[in-house]
Amino acid sequence: MNIKISEITKELELVGEGGFFGVKDKYGTDEREGVKKLLFKYENRYEKLNAERARVRFLQEYELSYPDYRYICGIDEVGRGPLAGPVIACAVILPKDCEILYINDSKQLSEKKREALYDEIMEKAISVGIGSASHARIEEINILQATYEAMRGAINKLGVVPELLLNDAVTIPKVVIPQVPIIKGDAKSISIAAASIVAKVTRDRLMVEYDTVFPGYGFASNKGYGSADHIKALKELGPSPIHRASFIKNLTSC
């Protein structure tokens, strides 16, 4: 008598990835279409999982290429382009053997995935530092210098002193720690990718809060970026206290 497919499913769940091929060998000669589909589904799942692990190992190559350094810090920012709100920078130090599946440049991830990864990063990281520069500070010293200031602030808030900085494309002035700028680093380094996610989630949450304080501009959805609805509201309502004057000077006469 053939074992029920539901029982095979339970067995597959019980043994997990490590025992899959044993179960596959056990039922590989079963001619039932349902069994074939079940085994294919699980094998495909584990193949995708292994491919993801390989992708994450590739993201670890920069960190692993500096074996003499224990504390390697990835740095990234978010918020250089919006019409309103601060620029936020994040510095993240991960353990050398840290595996965070599905981590990527924050721009490539859904909000739901970013939120889940944020929690995992905060749990696994050796240290996380977050820095910011307000809309007023951006106006005072310009967006580039404000970004550098936010990055320095993030470094200073780390619980340990990093030995090496991996930066997304930039070299940060007034920092004595060795730096390695990496073009499109948030897609090439696990530490920078982690920093991009934490910075993005932090700023997005802040803009959602601002939406309740300054309603009408749609900050909860546009996060301060220049969407059509945001620009329309800006023209109708005038600027809020967190708008960047130099960024909106061509959009409003206020």
Curated annotation (Swiss-Prot):
Any one annotated GO CC term: ribonuclease H2 complex
Matches recorded under PROSITE patterns: RNASE_H_2
Catalytic class of the enzyme: hydrolase
Alphabetically ordered keywords of this record: Cytoplasm, Endonuclease, Hydrolase, Manganese, Metal-binding, Nuclease
Protein residues bound to a divalent metal cation: D76, E77, D168
Domain RNase H type-2: residue ranges: 70-254
Listed HAMAP family: RNase_HII_B (MF_00052_B)
Task performed by this protein: Endonuclease that specifically degrades the RNA of RNA-DNA hybrids.
Family classification: Belongs to the RNase HII family.
Protein name: Ribonuclease HII
Organism name: Lachnoclostridium phytofermentans (strain ATCC 700394 / DSM 18823 / ISDg)
Lineage per the UniProt record: Bacteria, Bacillati, Bacillota, Clostridia, Lachnospirales
Gene: rnhB
